[in-house]
Amino acid sequence: MDQARAAPENIAKPIVWSIAGNDSGGGAGLSADARAAAAFGLHLCPVVAAVTAQNSVGVTRVEPVSPDLRYAQLAALGADMPPTAIKTGLLGSADNIAVVARWVDRLRARAPLALVVDPVLGASTGAAFADDAVLRAYRELLLPRATLVTPNAREARRLVDVCASED
């Protein structure tokens, strides 16, 4: 591991940044990513992209964090805890997708980096989180940089611009 990728000495596990939504119901987003990372022995650094108001039956509100706040979170981690991988979830806005894309490029200039894009475009209950600008940002900025993309069938159709009535 080169100096640009070296984690703080007190962290012996591989570092993964999860840039996703905070699910107040605890079933998805950063909560689920934290459980998955722990199961695989990874050190997860959660970066809050959006805050949701939701429970087990639905989502009542989604509030993306500002691009400045997202950038501040990434800059703090980038200065001290560089990742070997980034996993995205609910990003909430085209501006925030652009911030993530810039950080991926910046980190890859220093060392290899895997990017797993889970393009959360809506809730499992059907509520949509993504407008045309978000879809365009995914297509132009994140998907070309992705190592792996993990959409569900509905998200895949929206990302490739197939008629959503085929659900």
Residue ranges of each PLM-predicted region?
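A short helix->loop->beta-strand "cap" motif at the edges of active sites that frequently abuts
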Residues: 107-115
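Generic enzyme active-site microenvironment
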Residues: 85, 116-117, 150
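Conserved phosphate/ATP/ADP-binding segment of small-molecule kinases
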Residues: 128-167
